Amino acid sequence: MSRRRAVFFDRDGTLIEETHYCADPARVKIFPGVSAALRRLHDAGFLVFVITNQSGIGQGLMTEAQYRAVEAEVQRQAGEGLIDGVYFCADAPEEASARRKPQPGMVLEAAVEHGIDLEGSFFVGDKAADVECGRRAGTRTILVRTGYGVSEECPADFIAADAAAAVDWLLRNDS
């Protein structure tokens, strides 16, 4: 079986507006252009995954059921079938965790489960931890200037205005 390529996205602040421990599906607001960008990735043969830290669960600020309801709304707004998988880490920031970004555990898990070529893949996020996660996993990285990315500085392969612009760039520069 040939290895597949993927684009890994952070969720909060990258695909949807940052709302600080979103536990209510009514607060989910996907950024403009995200659904069309995800469709373009699928049309180009990429798998699409969401890689998200959800420490609000580990800190008792939301339940896993609330998280799953929010995630279902994200999937609905993004477009059914456009996100191939979601990996989340509920560990609190102070916990030692191989899965919590910037550690690459969730990306590596997805790569094994889906036969992904990480060198031919990308990680898109709004925080230095997202970029570092992608770098540690062996992907190319894109920092977006939405969410926390407005003020983040880190050595990403590219800096884009938003997720849609990131997809434009990666499709133009994919080799």
Regions found by a protein language model. Name each.
Residues 2-7, 64-85, 93-123, 127-175:
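Asp-based, Mg2+/Mn2+-dependent phosphohydrolase catalytic module
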